[in-house]
Structures are given as structure tokens and as C-alpha cells.
Regions:
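Active-site loop of short-chain dehydrogenase/reductase
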Residues: 2, 73-74, 119-132, 167-171, ...
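C-terminal helical subdomain
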Residues: 167-170, 174-175, 182, 191-229
Length: 229
């Protein structure tokens, strides 16, 4: 049985990704933050929930090491943890940037690094990190300075890791969604047409495809999933 990690497993996207991989025969290990009370109703024999603060480097490394000791390898990882904040240049202090850096980059790097090293040993594996338009395109980050800067480093990380993994079967991909159709966004953006947005299940489908054997020859560093948003 193949093994996948999904960070932020209790979020809208996280749950969709967990379900997709379980439905396709994976054993999924999902991370949640301490004191997360969101119920996760997945089959116990196919899903393992682990509480870990990915902002803490040592805890993140221990999580990966424990997982490898238990399962031997990891085939795919989908890193959905992150945070969001509004703010123009005038409104954004370095402390705001530091917070978004920690939420959006450190939480990804702390787990991507040990996973990357393990996958290089295996000579196989896919890591997917959820990016954002403001991180990819500065013009899309107007009014989201700290958030855009924090997310932008994810793209550079993927480039550097892919360069280091050249010649292996290890690929790091940044998935850039448009507006995601979630209850929270429907409440926050009234009057918009959710049909133009991207459903979490659609993102999960695309991620699973790129993790599957069908996409073994593809090495896409960035996947844009915008719909009409």
C-alpha cells in the first residue's frame, strides 16, 4: 500500500485530498495542529491522524522520522498548511512579514526538507506545496504584502529542490489555486458566483493525477488551477 502525507488535514482542501488518496488505495497520514477539534471521519485502517506543530523544526523532523520508521517510505506529500493576511505596504511591518513567513514558508520547509531527503534516498516521491497567486505574481498581491512575500519563497524552494533532484524520480510541485469554493469564502465574498471558483475536490483530483503513475513522465514545477476565478 502506498503512503501519503497530508498536512493541514482538517482544512477544506486537506480533507478533499485525504479522501481522494484514500479512495485510490493509499494509506494517508494527516497532520493537524494542537487543539484542533475538527472531526475527521475517515476509515481507521486507511487514515492516521498526527498532532504536530509544523512551525517547530525538530517536531516536524521527528514526525517524518517516526513515519519512515513505521511505514518504510513515503510516496507523496501534500502540504496545505498556511495562513493569510491583508495589508498594504504602509500597513505592513516587518513583524507582519515575519508572521506570514513562519505560517507559509517555515511550516512547508520544516517538513519538505526531511521528506525531500528521504525521497532522494528512495529515488522516488512527489511533494506538492500549496502556493498562491500573490506569491506567484506580484500584481495579484496588491494589498496582501506580507502574505505574498511569505508565499513567494515556496516557488523558489521548489525550483532549488527540483534542481538538486535532477536525474531522480523526485519532483516538487507548487499548486496555485484560484479562489477556492469553501463555506468561508462564500461568506467572505458575497455576491460572487462560486461556479467560477475552484472546488477543493477538483484540486485534489489534479494533485492525485500528478502523483499517479500516469503522470510519471511529467515534472511540472507549477500547476495553476484557476477555473474562471
Amino acid at each position: 500500500m502506498k503512503t501519503a502525507i497530508v498536512t493541514g488535514a482538517s482544512g477544506n482542501m486537506g480533507q478533499a485530498v485525504v479522501k481522494k488518496f484514500i479512495d485510490n488505495g493509499y494509506k494517508v497520514i494527516g497532520t493537524i495542529i494542537p487543539n484542533d477539534t475538527v472531526p475527521l471521519d475517515f476509515p481507521a485502517d486507511k487514515f492516521e491522524k498526527i498532532v504536530v506543530d509544523l512551525a517547530i523544526e525538530d517536531d516536524s523532523s521527528k514526525f517524518v522520522n517516526d513515519l519512515i520508521s513505521k511505514y518504510g517510505s513515503v510516496d507523496a506529500a501534500v502540504l496545505t498548511v498556511g495562513g493569510f493576511a491583508m495589508g498594504t505596504v504602509a500597513e505592513t511591518k516587518t513583524s507582519d512579514i515575519a508572521k506570514q513567513y513562519k505560517l507559509n514558508f517555515e511550516t512547508a520547509y520544516n517538513i519538505a526538507r526531511p521528506l525531500f531527503m528521504q525521497m532522494l534516498k528512495q529515488n522516488n516521491g512527489r511533494i506538492f506545496i500549496i502556493g498562491s497567486r500573490p506569491g506567484l505574481d506580484a500584481k495579484s498581491g496588491k494589498g496582501m504584502i506580507a502574505y505574498g512575500l511569505g508565499k513567494s519563497l515556496i516557488f523558489r524552494l521548489a525550483e532549488l529542490m527540483n534542481d538538486e533532484a535532477k536525474g531522480t524520480n523526485v519532483v516538487i510541485t507548487v499548486v496555485v489555486p484560484g479562489t477556492i469554493d469553501t463555506p468561508q469564502n462564500r461568506k467572505a465574498i458575497p455576491g460572487s458566483d462560486p461556479d467560477n471558483w475552484v472546488k477543493p475536490e477538483a484540486i485534489a483530483d489534479i494533485i492525485y493525477f500528478y502523483a499517479s503513475d500516469m503522470a510519471a513522465v511529467l515534472r511540472e514545477p507549477v500547476i495553476k488551477v484557476y477555473n474562471n476565478s
